[in-house]
Amino acid sequence: MGQCVTKCKNPSSTLGSKNGDRDPSSKSHGRRSASHREEQLPTCGKPGGDILVNGTKKAEAAPEACQLPTSSGDAGREPKSNAEESSLQRLEELFRRYKDEREDAILEEGMERFCNDLCVDPTEFRVLLLAWKFQAATMCKFTRKEFFDGCKAISADSIDGICARFPSLLTEAKQEDKFKDLYRFTFQFGLDSEEGQRSLHREIAIALWKLVFTQNNPPVLDQWLNFLTENPSGIKGISRDTWNMFLNFTQVIGPDLSNYSEDEAWPSLFDTFVEWEMERRKREGEGRGALSSGPEGLCPEEQT
């Protein structure tokens, strides 16, 4: 899984503010002044007569069809405010600090330095939250777009700004709908998109399940992970359906598994898990019973 299992604007940033409208032109000019301006702008004013093109008269162009050039060079785009320009500049400097020399992205080495400056371990839950907010496509990598869009999403443009967002991100992840979105993102995040993977390797899935449930560890999780760990030969990978349905499983099935039914539409791997866990508990109970039995008055260790 590499050195990291995840991928990350100053709280005072102000993005998207607008400049004021252009002051209207003065109305004190006379007709003569207006006429003079028209003569100076023949392309947008009204011509004095018909225009000859190759000796043929051509109808004069309608004044409304002409447009004056704008000082910005792009009439449809509003100029950025000073605050937004400053924020984008800080983001650019931050991105360049960690980006790869050959690729316009933050890769594993840069990610480690980024996490070190944030005072977080690359394998911890807070880094997964950043990857979620950045909508990172793969582990240990932030593209330029992911980094800029992600920092804007959390309104931070500096290391201190990102660190200041961690408490609110941790709180947000406790909301049921937000956690569901984070949970589903985590599956896609764990896939190797370059190889076109459609299922998670067993070891990656185990690590990501432990990570994503950092703040909310369901009672059945440890039993499930033990099952996956002790049955490596029978479990090659975890499909998206199995991953998504496990969240439902933790919400409706109790830790004793007594309300589980094979007749319901659960993935077949869940049937195998419940059968395996029930058998394990049966053997465990029989073992305890054997230790407690024996000749009356003798402890198990005193029997020969």
Curated annotation (Swiss-Prot):
Keyword field contains Ribonucleoprotein: no
Lipidation (N-myristoyl glycine): 2
Superkingdom assignment: Eukaryota
Location of the region described as Disordered in the Swiss-Prot/TrEMBL record: 1-87, 284-304
Alphabetized Pfam families for the sequence: Cullin_binding
Subunit note: Part of a complex containing DCUN1D3, CUL3 and RBX1. Interacts (via the DCUN1 domain) with the unneddylated cullins: interacts with CUL1, CUL2, CUL3, CUL4A, CUL4B and CUL5; these interactions promote the cullin neddylation and the identity of the cullin dictates the affinity of the interaction. Interacts preferentially with CUL3; this interaction triggers the relocalization of CUL3 to the cell membrane where CUL3 is neddylated. Interacts (via DCUN1 domain) with RBX1.
Listed PANTHER family: DCN1-LIKE PROTEIN 3, RP42 RELATED
Name under which the protein is recorded: DCN1-like protein 3
Organism: Bos taurus
Taxonomic lineage from the root: Eukaryota, Metazoa, Chordata, Craniata, Vertebrata
